[in-house]
Amino acid sequence: VQGIRTLTYGGVSVQVVIHMPSASVKDALVLYHPTVWFDDRTLPAAENTLDNFKRLLQRDDMLLVSVAYPQQNREIGEGLREAEAALLWVKNEASRALGLSIGRVFIAGHSQGAYIVTRLNTLHQTDGVIANAPGPLDFEYRCLLEERGNAPGSQECGLMVARHGPASANPAPYRRISLLSFTAGFKADALFVQGVGDSAIQMRSWPLFKQSVQACTDCQRPVFLEVAGGHDALFMSFEAREAFNQFIDQRRSR
């Protein structure tokens, strides 16, 4: 059974796409889509993200909740309010609202969705986090490239320039929301997947991110998997799919 639902938690409303398997549900996987910017694209992105992760899973006994968190006219990370509300609804209200008994709760995301789950892992306890090609890792660098004409312009950097001025003149707000600023305090084990053929911007900062997380002294266990392929490596690589399922299965059986 699959359907769209608007949920509210703590006064924050967000649309989600829910997949309820025919098998008896034991655990939940909350999903976060990549960058789409425009509000009218977030729901299709959430549906697409749900389908992609549903294909990855080797068994159909998890409640899947894909979150259509907003991005339009918001700085990177500002959609965290809605992303967080959906996670807390699944943790605290979904069992009663859906008539299920949910045990463990996992979160997963791709690209900016992986950024979101990594930040959520600093805020809330879950049973495991999967992040594929998380980013932006270094938003200052990304927007500096655009400022210098070395990368095509984006709405995300344009919004920051309008609010804070260019990165060259005021780098602090850009650094503050970069994922490189969120590499400590992880509350759950995390699997980070990265295709080594991803963009030059991503691969420039990936080793710095990996090194910083591995140096963390107050994190649960982070696992890094680098595989052949590009930005969508988790969905294309057999090795990544096996690691994804193993990561979840090991933590479901504890």
Located regions from the model:
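N-terminal cap/lid segment of alpha/beta-hydrolase-fold proteins
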Residues: V1-A23
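Proline/glycine-enriched tight loop/beta-turn segments at coil->beta junctions
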Residues: P21-L29, F186
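Short substrate-entry loop that stabilizes the transition state in hydrolases
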Residues: V25-K26, T35-R74
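C-terminal catalytic histidine-bearing segment of alpha/beta-hydrolase fold enzymes
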Residues: I76, A200, P207-K210, Q214-R254
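Gly/Ser-rich "nucleophile elbow"/oxyanion-hole loop immediately N-terminal to the catalytic nucleophile
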Residues: L88-S111
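Glycine-rich nucleophile elbow surrounding the catalytic serine of serine-hydrolase chemistry
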Residues: G109-R119
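Hydrolase active-site cap/lid region
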Residues: T118-A167
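Short beta-strand/loop motif that positions the catalytic acidic residue
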Residues: F186, F192-Q194
